[in-house]
Amino acid sequence: DQALDICENLGETVGVAIDVYHVWWDPQLANAIARAGRMNRIFAHHICDWLVPTRDMLLDRGMMGDGVIDLPAIRKMVEDAGFFGPQEVEIFSAENWWKRPGDEVLAVIKQRVASVC
């Protein structure tokens, strides 16, 4: 909601990214996403997963389906709010995914987006 308040003050060309890593835990998430949709301010939807335990708050994001985020529920909120743009995969994973061959990572991303998201 704070980001949306800022958007209102800065004008119609400013919006928000629904980044699941940063908002999945918020009990007011559904209301905030609905508000962003009413304002036409959802500009992006970033996906990954929250691993338990998390080894590093920045560089240990999980592949979709490996953690605890209810990705289908959040995607439904985003789509119910009127955003049907692409989901942007954001896997910051210094000790896991960044060490794997790119072709392998892309294959897993494709499979997970189709089956988990």
PLM segments and residue spans:
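Histidine-acidic metal/acid-base catalytic patches
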Residues: 1-18, 22-117
